[in-house]
UniProtKB/Swiss-Prot annotation:
<feature type="transmembrane region" description="Helical; Name=4">
    <location>
        <begin position="145"/>
        <end position="165"/>
    </location>
</feature>
<keyword id="KW-0472">Membrane</keyword>
<feature type="topological domain" description="Cytoplasmic">
    <location>
        <begin position="217"/>
        <end position="251"/>
    </location>
</feature>
<keyword id="KW-1003">Cell membrane</keyword>
<feature type="transmembrane region" description="Helical; Name=6">
    <location>
        <begin position="252"/>
        <end position="272"/>
    </location>
</feature>
<feature type="topological domain" description="Extracellular">
    <location>
        <begin position="1"/>
        <end position="34"/>
    </location>
</feature>
<feature type="transmembrane region" description="Helical; Name=5">
    <location>
        <begin position="196"/>
        <end position="216"/>
    </location>
</feature>
<feature type="topological domain" description="Cytoplasmic">
    <location>
        <begin position="127"/>
        <end position="144"/>
    </location>
</feature>
<feature type="transmembrane region" description="Helical; Name=1">
    <location>
        <begin position="35"/>
        <end position="55"/>
    </location>
</feature>
<keyword id="KW-0675">Receptor</keyword>
<dbReference type="Pfam" id="PF10292">
    <property type="entry name" value="7TM_GPCR_Srab"/>
</dbReference>
<feature type="topological domain" description="Cytoplasmic">
    <location>
        <begin position="325"/>
        <end position="377"/>
    </location>
</feature>
<keyword id="KW-0297">G-protein coupled receptor</keyword>
<feature type="transmembrane region" description="Helical; Name=3">
    <location>
        <begin position="106"/>
        <end position="126"/>
    </location>
</feature>
<dbReference type="InterPro" id="IPR019408">
    <property type="entry name" value="7TM_GPCR_serpentine_rcpt_Srab"/>
</dbReference>
<protein>
    <recommendedName>
        <fullName>Probable G-protein coupled receptor F27E5.8</fullName>
    </recommendedName>
</protein>
<feature type="topological domain" description="Extracellular">
    <location>
        <begin position="93"/>
        <end position="105"/>
    </location>
</feature>
Length: 377
């Protein structure tokens, strides 16, 4: 692709030219990065608060609490990965200096991608944990077997890290393609096409398995709950509690899965849109102005993906608090909006308190006066 005819061409990601670091991060890029960082700060604080809330309540089984907190940790690390990418680019725009390197940006992308994959896989392992709670509902609440969540949490991170290793070893690396054009290291997409397709495949299969598995678990627990034989034996109180909690926790997961489906659909739509205009620019350079109009000089349209992810980071804890009664009660108590609490009354506010300190004769007279008043009315 040849350089533009103008002696000082305007920057565009897929045009050759001698551009400065400040030019390679457009004003639109910088503004979107600032908005994204603001949203991610809110999301990180919410997820930290949710971790504290989940571990502070005993309404959920400890195994489930571990996996939910592991999911929140994935959101936090995903935000950290994005900050590692966005902050050097913002500095490049403001100070016209690139403080990053390919090693730094590869690690940042690895943290971001592995955390995003871990979040998507979290529902699969939560579904497996709820399946175990359904199968062994009689003893699951009393038996403290924490090897399940430890193995599940390990796999939840091992699979994405294994995929990152495969991406690093993939020969179809896109580094040479991106280095042909003026890009800062953190503007390069280090995920190869092969690993991108594998990632999408695993996420889709995991989502289908999560929805199907949670639906089966929910219906199975409803069927157990409607079985009246277990309610007349005090020995089975633990089973009764476990079945009830299985229903409440799986009921919580359906809105979270719906939330994941909505944001995943939006994200994939943005990726398809961005991929289309990138292919147009690389194959039909004459359509330069059209690409600039619909994709942006700095690929601003593709940054909608990061904004959607940041909004998802914020929405996940909010949805969890609203959909689970005990978590919602914890939130209301924390912010002081607790209608369940009974305001303590002072003794002098209680009706008839003044008579409690009066002499016995006065109390007796008052008692018969009240009786006379009631009989005469």
């Amino acid at each position: 692709m040849s350089e533009q005819d103008s002696s000082s061409p305007k920057y565009m990601r897929f045009l050759l030219g001698n551009f400065t670091s400040a030019e390679m991060v457009t004003d639109g890029n910088f503004l979107i990065y600032c908005i994204e960082m603001g949203l991610l700060v809110i999301g990180v604080l919410e997820n930290i608060f949710m971790i504290g809330a989940v571990f502070s309540t005993s309404c959920l089984h400890l195994n489930l609490r571990i996996l939910i907190c592991n999911c929140c940790l994935g959101f936090i690390l995903m935000a950290v990965g994005r900050a590692m990418i966005a902050v050097p680019l913002c500095i490049a725009h403001l100070r016209d200096v690139d403080i990053s390197s390919h090693a730094w940006c590869f690690i940042a992308n690895a943290v971001h991608h592995s955390s995003a994959d871990s979040v998507c896989l979290s529902f699969v392992f939560i579904m497996l944990e709820r399946t175990a709670g359904t199968i062994w509902s009689k003893d699951y609440e009393k038996t403290k077997i924490h090897i399940f969540p430890c193995i599940f949490a390990f796999l939840q991170w091992f699979i994405p890290m294994f995929m990152i290793l495969g991406n690093f070893l993939d020969r179809a690396n896109r580094m040479e393609h991106f280095l042909l054009y003026p890009h800062l290291p953190c503007q390069i997409e280090y995920l190869t096409p092969t690993m991108f397709m594998i990632t999408i495949f695993i996420i889709v299969i995991g989502f289908i398995a999560s929805v199907g598995g949670i639906t089966i678990v929910y219906n199975k627990n409803i069927k157990k709950y409607n079985t009246r034989d277990i309610w007349f034996n005090t020995v089975n109180l633990s089973e009764r509690y476990q079945i009830t909690e299985n229903i409440r926790s799986t009921h919580l997961l359906f809105p979270l899965l719906a939330l994941m489906l909505i944001f995943s659909t939006l994200s994939v739509s943005v990726l398809i849109y961005g991929g289309y205009w990138v292919s147009v620019m690389t194959k039909e350079p004459a359509r330069f102005e059209e690409v600039v109009k619909w994709f942006g000089r700095g690929g601003e349209a593709a940054q909608l993906f990061d904004i959607i992810t940041a909004i998802y980071t914020i929405s996940f804890p909010i949805c969890a608090f609203i959909c689970h009664p005990n978590l919602f009660r914890f939130l209301r108590k924390f912010i002081g909006w607790n209608s369940y609490a009974v305001r303590p009354s002072n003794l002098n506010e209680i009706g008839g308190f003044e008579m409690s300190t009066a002499p016995i004769r006065t109390q007796t007279e008052f008692h018969f006066q009240e009786l006379s008043r009631q009989w005469n009315t």
